[in-house]
C-alpha cells in the first residue's frame, strides 16, 4: 500500500508544473484544429511506426490503407483522440490536477499491463507532434506549449510504466 501512495505522490509531483494559461490556450487552440481527424492521426502513427500497429491484435499484420476505412479503426482512433481531448480540456488549471492524474494513472497502468514500452510511447509522441505540427500554424510558442504538456504527461506515465 505504501508503494502506491509513494507512486501517487511521484505522479502528482510530475504533473505539478501545469501549463500556464497561455500554454494551455495554445495547446487547446491547436488541438481544436485537428481533434476531429481521429483516423488520420492514428493512421499517421501506424504509418510512421508499424511496430505500434503490430501491438494491436485487431490491426496486426493487416494492410494499413485497408483498415484505415474500417469502423474498428475509426472506433479505436476516436478512443485515443478522446483521451487526449479530455486531458487537454483539463489543462491549464491547477484545480484539475487530480483529474488529470486519474486519467494518466489509468492509461499508464493499462498500457503497462499490455507491455507498452517507453520507446513505443515516445514513438507515438513523435508521430502525434509531427501530425499536429503539419496541420496547424506551428511556431516556437506552440511547440514549447506542446513540449511542456507532453513532458508532463510522459513523465507521469513513465513513472507508472517503469514501476
Swiss-Prot record:
User: Mind telling me which InterPro entries this protein's record contains?
Assistant: Erythrocruorin, Globin, Globin-like_sf, Globin/Proto, Mb-like_M
Q: Pfam families recorded for this chain?
A: Globin
SUPFAM superfamilies according to UniProt: Globin-like
Endpoints of the signal sequence: 1-16
Q: Give binding positions for heme b.
A: 76, 111
Instruction: Tell me the PROSITE patterns matching this sequence.
Output: GLOBIN
Indicate yes or no for the key word Metal-binding: yes
Q: Which UniProt keywords apply?
A: Heme, Iron, Metal-binding, Oxygen transport, Signal, Transport
In its UniProt record, a GO molecular function of this protein is:
oxygen binding
Question: In the UniProt record, does the keyword Metal-binding occur?
Answer: yes
Superkingdom per UniProt: Eukaryota
Gene3D superfamilies cross-referenced by the UniProt entry:
Globins
Domain (Globin): residue spans on this chain? 18-162
GO cellular component terms, semicolon-separated:
extracellular region; hemoglobin complex
Entry similarity comment: Belongs to the globin family.
Any further remark recorded for this protein: There are at least 12 different components in Midge globin.
What is the protein's given name?
Globin CTT-Z
The organism named in the record is Chironomus thummi thummi
Q: What gene is it encoded by?
A: CTT-Z
